[in-house]
Amino acid sequence: MERDEVSTSSSEGKSQEEAPMAEGLEPTEPIAFLKLFRFSTYGEIGWLFFGFIMCCIKALTLPAVVIIYSEFTSMLVDRAMQFGTSSNVHALPLFGGGKTLTNASREENNEALYDDSISYGILLTIASVVMFISGIFSVDVFNMVALRQVTRMRIKLFSSVIRQDIGWHDLASKQNFTQSMVDDVEKIRDGISEKVGHFVYLVVGFIITVAISFSYGWKLTLAVSSYIPLVILLNYYVAKFQGKLTAREQESYAGAGNLAEEILSSIRTVVSFGGEKSEVQRYENFLVPARKASQWKGAFSGLSDAVLKSMLYLSCAGAFWYGVNLIIDDRNVENKEYTPAILMIAFFGIIVGADNIARTAPFLESFATARGCATNLFKVIDLTSKIDPLSTDGKLLNYGLRGDVEFQDVFFRYPSRPEVIVHRGLNIRIRAGQTVALVGSSGCGKSTCVQLLQRFYDPVFGSVLLDDLDIRKYNIQWLRSNIAVVGQEPVLFLGTIAQNISYGKPGATQKEIEAAATQAGAHEFITNLPESYRSMIGERGSQLSGGQKQRIAIARALIQNPKILLLDEATSALDYQSEKQVQQALDLASKGRTTIVVSHRLSAIRGADKIVFIHDGKVLEEGSHDDLMALEGAYYNMVRAGDINMPDEVEKEDSIEDTKQKSLALFEKSFETSPLNFEKGQKNSVQFEEPIIKALIKDTNAQSAEAPPEKPNFFRTFSRILQLAKQEWCYLILGTISAVAVGFLYPAFAVIFGEFYAALAEKDPEDALRRTAVLSWACLGLAFLTGLVCFLQTYLFNYAGIWLTTRMRAMTFNAMVNQEVGWFDDENNSVGALSARLSGEAVDIQGAIGYPLSGMIQALSNFISSVSVAMYYNWKLALLCLANCPIIVGSVILEAKMMSNAVVREKQVIEEACRIATESITNIRTVAGLRREADVIREYTEEIQRVEVLIRQKLRWRGVLNSTMQASAFFAYAVALCYGGVLVSEGQLPFQDIIKVSETLLYGSMMLAQSLAFTPAFSAALIAGHRLFQILDRKPKIQSPMGTIKNTLAKQLNLFEGVRYRGIQFRYPTRPDAKILNGLDLEVLKGQTVALVGHSGCGKSTCVQLLQRYYDPDEGTIHIDHDDIQHDLTLDGVRTKLGIVSQEPTLFERSIAENIAYGDNRRSVSMVEIIAAAKSANAHSFIISLPNGYDTRMGARGTQLSGGQKQRIAIARALVRNPKILLLDEATSALDLQSEQLVQQALDTACSGRTCIVIAHRLSTVQNADVICVIQNGQVVEQGNHMQLISQGGIYAKLHKTQKDH
């Protein structure tokens, strides 16, 4: 639809803050965490409370294990050294342990130690069972609620966006909602799922363990825990900084995603003007802020991790020294305040609590990220639409609508450009059943009237009346159900032809669909297609020619049988014969209903009951055609500017009515019997009826989504990823060394810890203090080394991962934009699907060399070193401790397998949801005009619910497997120390070696479990890498010739200059059963202007696309001068010779100057050249009249300009290129007659001295061509200049006569 006045966001010269911003998108502070659960039902709140209780129960096992472990190890020291019972114990006596002994013999101590071991094993087994059961619910409950939450979030966000008014969409054009629905919502899910349960478990565990430590020994606890406030503050500020960095990162990625969508949806324009390299560079520039923010996040994470772990070992050093001093001071006191048991409980309570707090850091980061992502999303969700299309409010007329329309003193300006006034007191009255044409220069406000009547916008002042009632009083759905519109640039949706027509009347029968298509002149070409009405039309109708799309759009409007028909350049893309047929159908359809016509064609407006000439936002003239011609005013001048002169002899020859009708019938028959076909093809087909169509499309998608993916070779994929990251190898090597060092450090601490128990057993206080001092210094050294290597490990792997992600995004985008155009015709490569791959899989791949790989290397190092140390001290106990490893490894492998099987299907369904979202939001005007809001919301909801099902299947065993891994470690503690106690009681093992072996191996196995938990992320990274490498490895079918291009003697002797098509046979790759060109031969000599004419869909534009090498012919050759464009010229060499102005010009979300300069991406185009090109295209005057002139932003896809203004910018863009060959594909179809004459003069001047190929239905634009070629049945059937073809009296002459009389 035409947009009549520039209405853009701020120019580049203005700051971002000055630019108008859509409501709900203003920057704001992150929301409170609990508000993330705002979409929970009462039942889900109950589940959350239950999950919280389970987390608390699970947390209680921590202090219980601390007490049990401390009591047992204290008894171990007492029994082994025959000190007697130095501590009162409370847990061990529950199952026969903890007997009090005084002056007992070694045998009695050994028997008591045996009982202690059995009691310890039973108690810890009970704790393991409790942890297992509570752990299952603490994971699954939060995952379940989070999944339901984000499903609702996605649906509510999409629904809110779809329900917003068009003015809001104009302002929000830079916001990438599709990416937000995928990435941002997924980050919210990550922040409110099982991580909440883990966080509650850690915090509650911290509180309880610290409280118990204080209750047992407040002096030691106070001394050791003095650093905990520092830990809490550090976590708080790190989370705060990372939240801000995350917001910056998301903003950058949103900009990159928006650019990617714009470029991929406009790939033909990008390719035509050689913009691939510059767009890739712009995309990379968008990624820079995100990369820098991520690097800072990595640095903060590394610093936090280093400080927390260093403080942990420092506290151990302090606890060792201070605790031993307290015990020695109390050795000779009868009522001892500190004993080994109390020391262990207080010490372990603080260590476990501090470790819990340290482990909350990544969770806090996830929560901060979730809050940041949710802030703007929730504002959009909460936003109340000013014009809500799904509102049930408003009046519905039960008695029917008459159709009286009146614009009453209307003042209007677009929300995105409030300083530009479009209407200035517009007054128009249209009686029911009248046909009224709105005319005027391009950009005067005609199409704005159409949009106001549809209530896309509301007037700033004044009112639009329908049956004497302000349209704001009517229900919007009811209002739009009585209005049908056919726009200048028709938008069709991915699906079948039948489905697209039925969108005008949901539930229409096949008979009604065919009747509407016949009335619109589309039935003939549809039935000539192999799949007829079941034929798929591609994304945005890409499988159809412009004329075919327009006829489908007209059929879609006619099937609605509206009270008011709005025709905004409805026949601009049709040839004149088709236009006559369709115009007759529209004239017939106009009977009995109010019709408003916006057109530059005299044939479309001459028969109107009233013609309204609009100038400067006001009505300048109105009346019938004859009245206005008699007035000889502005309308008269506009009509005269479009007159076409014909030779007198031809007029006489064809003056007899019968002869004219016979000629028309012959011409019509010749076109109707030709093999009308798609200009591009499709893959799938479905049945006719609407319900069956949707069911079969859904089934097809389901089969596609559920098809087993090609199994990737993980080793080869990982090798390629490492090769891709070779620039970061030095970081990876140093990071690997650091990760290995971290893995070695804990076994070293376990040995120190075991020696500390030996120090407690020293009877001489001096020896005990001396050994403790050495161990404390060793802990200090360990703290320093741990801090250093932890920082390096986290930062370096994050650094390498971020660079890999950034590089992979850029490389994938580069590979996409360099594919041949036919690749984008495949529905599997829709814009939404490709954007989802860029934003999703390129992020997933970071797991291959980022933190997951780091954790796995650390765990492997730790496990190997732990096994080595344990085997050194006691191989029997070591093997027993390793018994839980198969359980852990098996659990993780099982989980990884289940997740990897679901991840590809999940991504495919998400891509389909993204396609629906992208298609709907991008074409929101068409969605609104067709009242499809509820339909697209339902379709999107169905896909998102399928995503929920797949994720639920993926996570169904998550709680069990996670709890198995954690509980198995506790159970292993029970078995290991129980058996170790037996060995000590039998004199086979020193007691301190039990501590060394068990601590070393059990921590190693837990680390193995934690690292193997990264396996799903690592597996997902390899799957993502495999899918991205498929894109990177794909060689475009259209490439520059290989090797050196030779200048052969034959080429030197070939003196031909110009463009030559020889024996061209062609079918579109996605439509191999439909032949487009059948042996076409055509020569365009250097400097000639050659026009191609023929029926809509005959293949005229195909000739241009083959010349641009969008496709290559199946047979035959195309030459530019003496060079075969396939074998003798590079792609760039071909396209730099060409300048294109297409029927539906695509402009970018940039300034007018940047869009014009886009015509030549090989160099920096000066402002002088830009202005000169604009003047040549008759665009300079309207550009400088804008407040920001050439710096005016264009809006998404140039929506801030009228159709005529966009076309003139496109012409200027082609002229600035100074091409050798100029291609004009309906270059003036969107212009009013006056502007067309001026622009045509400019084009005539531009064509002077260069070769031009012109495609046009309006013969006024081609009558001065040197050669005119009529294409029929894929061949040139007539050619000559205008006078020659007229004198021949053939097809062209009859077509010309038709237009003259029309």
Swiss-Prot record:
Binding site for ATP 2: G1094, H1095, S1096, G1097, C1098, G1099, K1100, S1101
Highest taxon of the lineage: Eukaryota
PROSITE patterns: ABC_TM1F (PS50929), ABC_TRANSPORTER_1 (PS00211), ABC_TRANSPORTER_2 (PS50893)
UniProt name for this protein: Multidrug resistance protein homolog 65
Family stated for the protein in its record: Belongs to the ABC transporter superfamily. ABCB family. Multidrug resistance exporter (TC 3.A.1.201) subfamily.
Organism: Drosophila melanogaster (Fruit fly)
Extracellular side: 70-118, 216-223, 324-341, 754-776, 874, 978-993
Native organism taxonomy: Eukaryota, Metazoa, Ecdysozoa, Arthropoda, Hexapoda
Pfam families: ABC_membrane, ABC_tran
